[in-house]
Amino acid sequence: MKVRPSVKPICEKCKIIKRKGRVMVICENPRHKQKQG
């Protein structure tokens, strides 16, 4: 899980979702998981 000020999809399988008011990227590739903040 990477924590970044700006989250962007890295590949075509990355999905941007909102959980508990936080923007997150979830993906099949665990290296692409990101959290904003």
Swiss-Prot record:
UniProt cross-references to PROSITE patterns, sorted A to Z: RIBOSOMAL_L36
InterPro entries for the chain: Ribosomal_bL36 (IPR000473), Ribosomal_bL36_sp (IPR035977)
The keyword Nucleus belongs to this UniProt entry's keyword annotation: no
GO cellular component: cytoplasm; ribonucleoprotein complex; ribosome
GO biological process, one term: translation
MF term (GO), any: structural constituent of ribosome
Keyword annotations of the record: Ribonucleoprotein, Ribosomal protein
Sequence intervals crossing the membrane: none
NCBIfam families associated with the record: rpmJ_bact
Family: Belongs to the bacterial ribosomal protein bL36 family.
Protein name as it appears in the record: Large ribosomal subunit protein bL36
Organism: Clostridium kluyveri (strain ATCC 8527 / DSM 555 / NBRC 12016 / NCIMB 10680 / K1)
